[in-house]
From Swiss-Prot:
This is Cytochrome b. Its cofactor is heme b. Belongs to the cytochrome b family. The gene is MT-CYB. It comes from Mycteria americana (Wood stork). Gene3D superfamilies: Cytochrome Bc1 Complex, Chain C.
Length: 380
């Protein structure tokens, strides 16, 4: 019998073992679709970004005009830009749901996969931040100024570090140039990290909603999950194109239609919606260094998840108390997101402080305690 090239060719064999003949748990739900959706997001962002980069000029005098030129004069330039800007939002929606799934179903117990995933999230956040600066509107400029300035809170080396990052004494042309270079480079770094993430995942195999070993009941990835993933792509690309075509500026800030002006500060400086929860935590602490540490901790706390797991069961499927806590945390994050978009005044200050406190309390104290309590309840 002739050898099957799909199973004998060195390169095709790798693809086959990752996407075609991969043994997959038969009971994984739609929550397991977000990994492939993130892959589609990354591909879309790299393609649209590449096309935008061919028409973009990384210079303070020309950046804003070059983006306007892309939208007005380039064939379908407006569409490419709208897909790229809103594609970032969908990227974050998918990654947050993907992390939520991992947290709910105890996927963080695959430590290497989880840790590379958190590194991927941090890289994505960095990419989105430097990308937001490129159109060189008011919010681009002031967002870059405020967020990079946070590094000056680091004792002893802070100020030097910030001036080194800026390439001068304020956000200016050198900053824009290096941010463009970083924004071009980082997505390819994300692609590389994704391969590492997948390599670690395929070492252990996928988790499943029951959190039990599924070796006795596996099915091939293709055609079952390849088809399921295609349905997922369609269900994501539909709202993305709808948003890009009908209300492309819905999630943006009107302030960014004004070219950057270092002499005029916008009344409310705020990041894109997907950073608002972290921004609210940053603002809730009246001390600069304390705020920066809390901001960093709000994301880095994910690294602690495997260490804080105290339950005998892996998933929350049969743990009603942990489920209640999980959805409280979800509501808490939505409150933080809302507070982050509001001005710094009463009652938003106190709401933000309480929400920040509960965020850390739930993750660091209540989840491990509830896990231990549920173990006790199992014995009754």
């Amino acid at each position: 019998m002739a050898p099957n090239i799909r199973k004998s060719h060195p390169l095709l064999k790798m693809i086959n073992n990752s996407l075609i003949d991969l043994p997959t748990p038969s009971n994984i739900s739609a929550w397991w679709n977000f990994g492939s959706l993130l892959g589609i997001c990354l591909t879309t962002q790299i393609l649209t970004g590449l096309l935008l980069a061919t028409h973009y000029t990384a210079d303070t005098t020309l950046a804003f005009s070059s983006v306007a030129h892309t939208c007005r004069d380039v064939q379908y330039g407006w569409l490419i830009r709208n897909l790229h800007a809103n594609g970032a939002s969908f990227f974050f929606i998918c990654i947050y749901l993907h992390i939520g799934r991992g947290f709910y179903y105890g996927s963080y117990l695959y430590k290497e996969t989880w840790n590379t995933g958190v590194i991927l999230l941090l890289t994505l956040m960095a990419t989105a931040f430097v990308g937001y600066v490129l159109p060189w509107g008011q919010m681009s400029f002031w967002g870059a100024t405020v967020i990079t300035n946070l590094f000056s809170a680091i004792p002893y080396i802070g100020q030097t570090l910030v001036e080194w990052a800026w390439g001068g004494f304020s956000v200016d042309n050198p900053t824009l140039t290096r941010f463009f270079a970083l924004h071009f480079l980082l997505p390819f770094m994300i692609a590389g990290l994704t391969l590492i993430h997948l390599t670690f995942l395929h070492e252990s195999g996928s988790n499943n909603p029951l959190g039990i070993i599924s070796n006795c009941d596996k099915i091939p990835f293709h055609p079952y999950f390849s088809l399921k993933d295609i349905l997922g792509f369609l269900l994501m690309l539909l709202p993305l194109t709808a948003l890009a075509l009908f209300s492309p500026n819905l999630l943006g800030d009107p302030e960014n239609f004004t070219p950057a002006n270092p002499l005029v500060t916008p009344p409310h400086i705020k990041p894109e919606w997907y950073f608002l929860f972290a921004y609210a935590i940053l603002r809730s602490i009246p001390n600069k260094l304390g705020g920066v540490l809390a901001l960093a901790a709000s994301v880095l706390i994910l690294f602690l998840c495997p260490l804080l797991h105290k339950s005998k069961q892996r998933t929350m499927t049969f743990r009603p108390l942990s489920q209640l806590l999980f959805w409280t945390l979800t509501a808490n994050l939505l409150i933080l997101t809302w507070v982050g978009s509001q001005p710094v005044e009463h009652p938003f200050i106190i709401i933000g402080q309480l929400a920040s406190l509960t965020y850390f309390s739930i993750l660091l104290i209540l989840f491990p305690l509830t896990g231990a309590l549920e173990n006790k309840l199992l014995n009754y």
